[in-house]
Amino acid sequence: QGGAPWNPIPP
């Protein structure tokens, strides 16, 4: 995913 505030899960 990434590291956005709504998805703090690493890629």
UniProtKB/Swiss-Prot annotation:
It is found in: Secreted. Expressed by the venom gland. Keywords: Hypotensive agent, Metalloenzyme inhibitor, Metalloprotease inhibitor, Protease inhibitor, Pyrrolidone carboxylic acid, Secreted, Toxin. GO terms for biological process: regulation of blood pressure. The keyword Ribonucleoprotein does not apply. The modification Pyrrolidone carboxylic acid is found at residue 1. GO terms for molecular function: peptidase inhibitor activity; toxin activity. It comes from the Eukaryota. One of its GO terms (cellular component) is extracellular region. Belongs to the bradykinin-potentiating peptide family. This peptide both inhibits the activity of the angiotensin-converting enzyme (ACE) and enhances the action of bradykinin by inhibiting the peptidases that inactivate it. It acts as an indirect hypotensive agent. This is Bradykinin-potentiating peptide 11b.
